[in-house]
Amino acid sequence: MSAPIIDGKQISQDIRASIQQEVIRLKEHSFQPGLAVVLVGEDPASQVYVKNKEKACHDLGYYSEVHRLAADTSQEALLELVDKLNHQSTIHGILVQLPLPKHIHEKAVIDAIAVEKDVDGFHPVNVGNLVIGDDSLLPCTPAGVIELIKRAGVEIAGKHAVVIGRSNIVGKPVSLLLQRENATVTMCHSRTANIADLSRQADILVVAIGKANFIDASFVKPGAVVIDVGMNRLENGKLAGDVDFESVKQVSGPITPVPGGVGPMTITMLMQNTLVAAKRSHGLA
């Protein structure tokens, strides 16, 4: 018997519909959320991501700016642009598309973004607030993971969650968010002994390691919720997650597919963060 599929596309559409209604209400206060996206260089994947963010802004009625800079743009010039956007009243969220060219220090750029406009949730102050449980703009993909679990009707509190992967972008923040929801969390990584044994103990399994089809049914406890954050391009051009979907869905509980699971949520949560930042800037949140 196959597991229920967590439809990230539909959940994302539902959230966007709510955002759209709120934007309409905000326009009654004579302002609209504004997002600035900065792209340095011509990385093909980054160009696609930026276009998708631009489209989301248009669809939801946001004000948006896209700043496309040459690959040889200096760090100083990029920081000057960030500072300008920090002081621009029509912009409530700033996103600098990663990765940056090697001559630019990513941390210096992230640190330069105003905390209240850091809609990626990467600024050290927002990361610190995440750790101690204070209100902050949350990293988009981890926030999307939590939203998917909740909207699948899963009670997180009291569950044993296993997170495979410890990246600063997904693994670490998603483990903190799961703890905030009162799960007991085990984090696994490349140096973890007996990953399969630990994985089989999970009521909720989140996988973000960047290895196509790494997790098969032998890693999964029957009925466990499985969230696949992986996005890997196979030699045949198809996308695959970190989870062997066809194998795992035979034993798991609710499971996210790739594509169509976590992916659609990332930009939606970025739009949500921008909305929150806009409301806060006007004393409405």
Spans of model-derived segments:
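Short, well-structured alpha-helical segments in soluble
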Residues: 77-89
